[in-house]
């Protein structure tokens, strides 16, 4: 997809809430990716990120180990950002479903 962000100073505006949320996700991914470079997480690093940063959306009893094992392409026990994004998408779906049930 590439980078589409404007490099022009006059185009620089305050980021929207969604843009800030995406930047926060990326920063958190990089903060937890210690072993083997900033572009991947080990299953252990992903587990730490999820348990520390998403304790209410993905509590420890939500089958986290199985979800991690089933994520994307787990080559050499390294998970790329896309796999993390899959997990975030799953968490977002559960919030949407929960809100829909509560709204009924």
Curated annotation (Swiss-Prot):
Q: Where are the transmembrane segments?
A: none
Assigned keywords, A-Z: Apoptosis, Cytoplasm
* Record's subcellular location: Cytoplasm
Which Gene Ontology MF annotations are present?
calcium ion binding; calcium-dependent protein binding; chemokine receptor binding
| Principal location listed in the UniProt entry | cytoplasm
Residues annotated as domain EF-hand: 27-61
GO biological process, any:
apoptotic process
Cellular component terms (Gene Ontology) = extracellular space; perinuclear region of cytoplasm
The entry's function note states: Modulates P53/TP53 protein levels, and thereby plays a role in the regulation of cell survival and apoptosis. Depending on the context, it can promote cell proliferation or apoptosis. Plays a role in the regulation of cell migration by modulating the levels of MMP2, a matrix protease that is under transcriptional control of P53/TP53. Does not bind calcium.
Oligomer status and interactors: Homodimer. Interacts with AGER.
Instruction: Output this protein's name.
Output: Protein S100-A14
Give the originating organism. Bos taurus (Bovine)
């Amino acid at each position: 997809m590439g980078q589409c962000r404007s490099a022009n100073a006059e185009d620089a505006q305050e980021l929207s809430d969604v843009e800030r949320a995406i930047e926060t996700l990326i920063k958190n991914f990089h903060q937890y990716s210690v072993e083997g470079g900033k572009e991947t997480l080990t299953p252990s690093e992903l587990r730490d990120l999820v348990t520390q940063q998403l304790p209410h959306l993905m509590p420890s009893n939500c089958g986290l180990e199985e979800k991690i094992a089933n994520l994307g392409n787990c080559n050499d026990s390294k998970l790329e950002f896309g796999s993390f994004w899959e997990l975030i998408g799953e968490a977002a779906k559960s919030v949407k479903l929960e809100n829909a049930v509560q709204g009924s």
